[in-house]
């Protein structure tokens, strides 16, 4: 199948052939949801830790005798009902990682890319280069392409500091190379702009 190519000025500039297996796959919402949730869960640190009554410092002695005081019986001042006591159901470090095999992951990415094409939210440009880090110049490119809330995906060799510096101060605009794309970044933006080189690298990885 072919996708239209636009110049950075927004004009038609030809077509590029792409693999139907990558850009015309069936939409699988449940798979996308599962992979996105797993990806975001894997990003959690899971390092939160609290102390139970047995781990809190102090509280070795019985605070008062068992009977005769009129007070409720107590065996330690580190009980959860006391100030400075332990936590009843203390949080412990845990891993939130979920298993997602390569076939599921690549299937979700293909499904997202294909839906971007079908919904006319994907744009392909010849290349994307800036000689100097100028936010104003990058803003002109974004406006010329007529896209908002957009992720620019470039080839590994095309990505440089100029692109990063030029785009980082623009609201709802981001730039990454083809290696860094993931299901979350693809679904978080309304539009995605790919360079020809990025398309080629993604196909090599997914086909």
UniProtKB/Swiss-Prot annotation:
| A GO biological process held by the record | translation
List, alphabetically, the InterPro entries matched. Answer: Ribosomal_uL4 (IPR002136), Ribosomal_uL4-like (IPR013005), Ribosomal_uL4_dom_sf (IPR023574)
What keywords tag this UniProt record? Ribonucleoprotein, Ribosomal protein, RNA-binding, rRNA-binding
Kindly state one GO CC term assigned in the UniProt record: ribonucleoprotein complex
A Gene Ontology molecular function term of the record: rRNA binding
Entry's family note: Belongs to the universal ribosomal protein uL4 family.
What binding partners and quaternary form does the record give? Part of the 50S ribosomal subunit.
- Which NCBIfam families does the record match to this protein? rplD_bact
The name under which this protein is listed is Large ribosomal subunit protein uL4
- Organism of origin: Francisella philomiragia subsp. philomiragia (strain ATCC 25017 / CCUG 19701 / FSC 153 / O#319-036)
Q: What is the lineage of its organism?
A: Bacteria, Pseudomonadati, Pseudomonadota, Gammaproteobacteria, Thiotrichales
């Amino acid at each position: 199948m072919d996708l239209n190519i636009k110049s950075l000025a927004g004009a038609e500039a030809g077509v590029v052939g792409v693999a139907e297996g990558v850009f015309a796959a069936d939409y699988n919402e449940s798979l996308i949801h599962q992979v996105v949730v797993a990806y975001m869960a894997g990003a959690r640190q899971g390092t939160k830790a609290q102390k139970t009554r047995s781990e809190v410092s102090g509280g070795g002695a019985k605070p008062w005798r068992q009977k005769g005081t009129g007070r409720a019986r107590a065996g330690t001042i580190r009980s959860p009902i006391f100030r400075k006591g332990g936590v009843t159901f203390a949080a412990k470090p845990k891993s939130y990682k979920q298993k997602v095999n390569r076939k599921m992951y690549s299937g979700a990415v293909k499904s997202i890319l294909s839906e971007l094409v079908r919904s006319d939210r994907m744009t392909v440009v010849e290349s994307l280069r800036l000689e100097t880090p100028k936010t104003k110049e990058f803003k002109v490119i974004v406006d010329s392409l007529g896209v908002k809330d957009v992720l620019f995906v470039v080839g590994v060799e095309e990505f440089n500091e100029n692109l990063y510096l030029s785009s980082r101060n623009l609201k709802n605009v981001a730039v990454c190379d083809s290696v860094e794309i993931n299901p979350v970044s693809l679904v978080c933006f309304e539009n995605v702009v790919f360079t020809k080189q990025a398309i080629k690298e993604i196909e090599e990885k997914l086909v």
